[in-house]
């Protein structure tokens, strides 16, 4: 039986990995390639249009075999099947986890509590498509009869990061008849700058909040409504300029939005897994229903690859297991996501929520403390080549071991071919430099003065993977996002954490609700926080002005 819920470090599969590490750790990547020149052609895997080269990871084929054995021992195949079947694998909230149903084809059956959810998914997609076509064609007009020119998505977390990332990633495919802006921060600057130069009569707001009570989103939505009504006057204008992505019809109606323009989703879709649900309405308006269907097809193709491919050739499983190897055995606590494509400039930020909110847990799914190992690596990054002139110094010569995921495309979406060759040359060069470095002898052979030799030496042996695709398309983006979704799931199974809850965000919300009343109190409030927080509140109240 799989040893899924016992302490990870006590499992025979983990101990086998530790013994293997003792043999492998003394070997530099230079030595691994010297012993096995063909590893660059063998330590690769392909799926859903993506090519993964992990030969510059500090692993061998035996490492991958042992990692796959660990996944088997922790019950990954069984947990994966349970998720696809619609079982309640989000144990702390008692919910199914079925983002895979959002991209299931018509006719497939996926049951939640005995009910097939696929027809519901496609009913929403069909309504989204009809609405998107209306906005794109100009058939949907504002209250004064003007055509919509700007779409503003108002959300936070998964209701913002996914749509904002997808729009920036797919700008090459987006209609040029519409502009798109995204508001998430409760900081009024975000909304003020988003609407600064807009004509209210030509602006459509998409308000994304499942409950329609999310503090940040509804604060921004209320201010946006005030901005609109200050210009258009008539409260009936709200129904032509606001659309809801929500399941709370009563609150939607109270806000002034026609429930006919409410697009729902389900409690089996977590926010950070929702960009291909109704939360993606802004994406569909931008790239059109056909482009959105291509996005879903890419998700689906990777879903099927994750479900069916052997673990040792399974891209999401490999990404997830290599992450466990790097974090828990090699000590690389952070992952730099380095897309060599400017269109993916928000992809690292998107992955921050997907990975860190999912697996940043200190207790197991059953509530026991995680024993003796970390969970949830820290994800960060910037597009190449910007990062090379920022933080790559630390990657190459710093004291922290950082695992890197390079992402690149063989064909650009522009006609500046030499630019792309230079870009990709840098991608390949960085992976090579991180892996092999430069020895003191090589530095001296180049004529480096002896006092500078230590400064011109690169240790190498820094692990990285490279993900290549032919071109960035909606389909490729869907596959890329699903790759990391399922990698996160894989890691959650290994660590035995619930990757689909986020209780850690709750305490700050509760305290903020208490503090805002103290900030807004006309009389001096009786503060009962710690001394630091009390002093900060008093200083703010004294200095904020009128």
From Swiss-Prot:
Protein name: Glucose-6-phosphate isomerase
Matches recorded under InterPro entries: G6P_Isomerase, G6P_Isomerase_C, Phosphoglucose_isomerase_CS, SIS_dom_sf, SIS_PGI_1, SIS_PGI_2
PROSITE patterns, sorted: P_GLUCOSE_ISOMERASE_1 (PS00765), P_GLUCOSE_ISOMERASE_2 (PS00174), P_GLUCOSE_ISOMERASE_3 (PS51463)
Record keywords: Cytoplasm, Gluconeogenesis, Glycolysis, Isomerase
Pathway assigned in UniProt: Carbohydrate biosynthesis; gluconeogenesis; Carbohydrate degradation; glycolysis; D-glyceraldehyde 3-phosphate and glycerone phosphate from D-glucose: step 2/4
Family in the record: Belongs to the GPI family.
GO terms for cellular component: cytosol
Record has Cytoplasm as a keyword: yes
Top-level class of the enzyme under EC nomenclature: isomerase
Natural source organism: Anaeromyxobacter sp. (strain K)
UniProt cross-references to NCBIfam families, sorted A to Z: PRK00179.1 (NF001211)
């Amino acid at each position: 039986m799989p040893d899924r819920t016992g302490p990870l470090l006590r499992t025979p599969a983990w101990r086998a990995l530790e013994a293997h590490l003792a043999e492998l750790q003394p070997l530099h990547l230079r030595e691994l390639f010297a012993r096995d020149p063909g590893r660059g052609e063998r330590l690769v895997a392909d799926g859903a249009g993506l090519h993964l080269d992990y030969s510059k990871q500090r692993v061998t084929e035996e490492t991958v075999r042992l990692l796959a054995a660990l996944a088997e021992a922790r019950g990954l195949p069984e947990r994966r099947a349970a998720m696809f079947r619609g079982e309640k694998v989000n144990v702390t909230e008692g919910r199914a986890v079925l983002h895979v149903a959002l991209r299931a084809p018509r006719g497939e059956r996926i049951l939640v509590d005995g009910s097939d959810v696929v027809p519901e998914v496609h009913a929403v997609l069909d309504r989204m498509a009809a609405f998107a076509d209306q906005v794109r064609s100009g058939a949907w007009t504002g209250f004064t009869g003007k055509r919509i020119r700007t779409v503003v998505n108002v959300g936070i977390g998964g209701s913002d990061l996914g749509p904002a990332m997808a729009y920036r990633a797919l700008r090459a495919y987006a209609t040029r008849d519409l502009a798109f802006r995204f508001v998430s921060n409760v900081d009024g600057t975000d909304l003020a700058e988003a609407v600064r130069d807009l004509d209210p009569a030509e602006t459509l707001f998409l308000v994304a909040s499942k409950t329609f009570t999310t503090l940040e989103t509804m604060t921004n939505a209320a201010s946006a409504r005030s901005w609109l009504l200050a210009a258009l006057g008539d409260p009936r204008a709200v129904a032509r300029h606001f659309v809801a992505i929500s399941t709370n019809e009563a609150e939607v109606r109270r806000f002034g939005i026609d429930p006919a323009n409410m697009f729902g989703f389900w409690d089996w879709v977590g926010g950070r897994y929702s960009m291909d649900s109704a939360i993606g309405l802004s994406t569909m308006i931008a790239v059109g229903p056909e482009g959105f269907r291509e996005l879903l097809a890419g998700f689906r193709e990777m879903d099927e690859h994750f479900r069916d491919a052997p673990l040792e050739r399974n891209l999401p499983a490999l990404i997830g297991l290599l992450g466990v190897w790097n974090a828990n055995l090699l000590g690389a606590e952070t992952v730099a996501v380095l897309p060599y494509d400017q269109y993916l400039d928000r992809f690292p930020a998107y992955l921050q929520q997907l990975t860190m909110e999912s697996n940043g847990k200190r207790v197991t799914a059953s509530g026991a403390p995680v024993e003796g190992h970390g969970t949830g690596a820290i994800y960060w990054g910037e597009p190449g080549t910007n990062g090379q002139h920022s933080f790559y110094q630390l990657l190459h010569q710093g004291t922290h071991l950082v695992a890197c995921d390079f992402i690149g495309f063989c064909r650009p979406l522009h006609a500046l071919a030499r630019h792309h060759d230079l870009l990709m040359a840098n991608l390949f060069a960085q992976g090579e430099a991180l892996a092999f470095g430069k020895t003191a002898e090589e530095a001296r052979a180049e004529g480096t003065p002896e006092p500078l030799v230590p400064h011109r030496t690169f240790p190498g042996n820094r692990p990285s993977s490279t993900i290549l695709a032919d071109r960035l398309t909606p389909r490729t983006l869907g596959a890329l996002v699903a790759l990391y979704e399922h990698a996160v799931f894989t890691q959650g199974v290994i660590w035995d954490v619930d990757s689909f809850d986020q209780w850690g965000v709750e305490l700050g919300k509760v305290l903020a609700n208490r503090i805002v009343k103290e900030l807004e109190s006309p009389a001096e409030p009786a503060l009962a926080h710690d001394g630091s927080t009390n002093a900060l509140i008093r200083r703010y109240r004294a200095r904020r002005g009128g």
